[in-house]
Amino acid sequence: MSPQTETKASVGFKAGVKEYKLTYYTPEYQAKDTDILAAFRVTPQPGVPPEEAGAAVAAESSTGTWTTVWTDGLTSLDRYKGHRYRIERVIGERDQFIAYVAYPLDLFEEGSVTNMFTSIVGNVFGFKALRALRLEDLRIPPAYVKTFQGPPHGIQVERDKLNKYGRPLLGCTIKPKLGLSAKNYGRAVYECLRGGLDFTKDDENVNSQPFMRWRDRFLFCAEAIYKSQAETGEIKGHYLKATAGTCEEMMKRAVFARELGVPIVMHDYLTGGFTANTSLAHYCRDNGLLLHIHRAMHAVIDRQKNHGIHFRVLAKALRMSGGDHIHSGTVVGKLEGERDITLGFVDLLRDDFVEQDRSRGIYFTQDWVSLPGVLPVASGGIHVWHMPALTEIFGDDSVLQFGGGTLGHPWGNAPGAVANRVALEACVQARNEGRDLAQEGNEIIREACKWSPELAAACEVWKEIRFNFAAVDVLDK
């Protein structure tokens, strides 16, 4: 017997398996201000008590494993273990529970979303004792928030760079998303920007394919930006997508965008990964580039109500990792997004301090201290008739992005941009005059049609378009 084994045996080590709840279920635990708090929706397998299921989550996402190990005696488990300190039954669900877990801050590397997620949502999601598991929310303590740079610039700095205030920003995703040559792509960018949009965007599907290599696209888009700026007197931008197969290639594209003098680049933070995203965000801050974030792949992770990670958690992770814009759903368009839930995570993106509010799905009070805010981007199946609702729902600090709702205009791209800009200006003016956009929205748009034939044509095309489907992810009643 080795000396280490003898020493361990002498202090009472007992090999074997014991229930997780004996160590990790600690209802008497008082969460510390420095703890990371998590709310999990737990669906145990039949026969597994909820206390044991919740404790298993705390164990397997912190210091625990399936059996006792003698090396437990070489550290302080009470200092490092996760604490499942509260559990509550989900209203209206027989076999679902919300388990609250507190994680000591020393479990996590400073400034690393990658490490935080690897621990909290790692192997535990495949645990056999659980039928399903969903991370509903995280409370990130200020002590941990302060280890992150966060967004490269934030809302106020972006407005100052663009010299645009008092209204939402307008964007457009270039369509068709795939197949255009670089020159034709640049032409569409120019026409949309000249027509009155603030931004155009690479579709998330666009990278560097045989029909359009990234360098060619960057050059033609830069030409379109400068030409439209000269003609309109407004600062313009195009989200040049830097996402690539390697981090080195991603950075090369960002460097080229900076050399062209364009104001903004784009990244897919979920498919590209948190490490790559954080690296790009640091580069963007150091070099004066805004960073637009797309959430491609999010619905694979967040759409099902009983399993995965809620988007409010992914939104918090993005604010920590870094991004100046992120797509957040529209409430009224073609993509999933219930109003109260959407407004909850929009506040988590923009505000410095957000109170707990279960009516909007916010499980914890979140203090972002000095971390800059992120502009939510409403995009997906929206058109001019949606403008009053979008302006009322998202307010000024947002980006309203119309792809088909610009490029599908019967008269072409520039008139489509004009229609959207006129509709937005009409809604902002009406709101500033005290009119109710929710009740008078259609009337406001019809009035604006009288002095904008471009808007009138757009209204005629999309007057019957609705996306009236029940949301999959809704609040517990």
From Swiss-Prot:
Its EC number is 4.1.1.39. GO terms for cellular component: chloroplast. PROSITE patterns: RUBISCO_LARGE. The active site is at K175, H294. The modification N-acetylproline is found at P3. It catalyses: 2 (2R)-3-phosphoglycerate + 2 H(+) = D-ribulose 1,5-bisphosphate + CO2 + H2O; D-ribulose 1,5-bisphosphate + O2 = 2-phosphoglycolate + (2R)-3-phosphoglycerate + 2 H(+). Keywords: Acetylation, Calvin cycle, Carbon dioxide fixation, Chloroplast, Disulfide bond, Lyase, Magnesium, Metal-binding, Methylation, Monooxygenase, Oxidoreductase, Photorespiration, Photosynthesis, Plastid. Its cofactor is Mg(2+). It comes from the Eukaryota. The keyword RNA-binding does not apply. HAMAP family: RuBisCO_L_type1. The basic functional RuBisCO is composed of a large chain homodimer in a 'head-to-tail' conformation. In form I RuBisCO this homodimer is arranged in a barrel-like tetramer with the small subunits forming a tetrameric 'cap' on each end of the 'barrel'. This is Ribulose bisphosphate carboxylase large chain. It comes from Petunia hybrida. The lineage of its organism: Eukaryota, Viridiplantae, Streptophyta, Embryophyta, Tracheophyta.
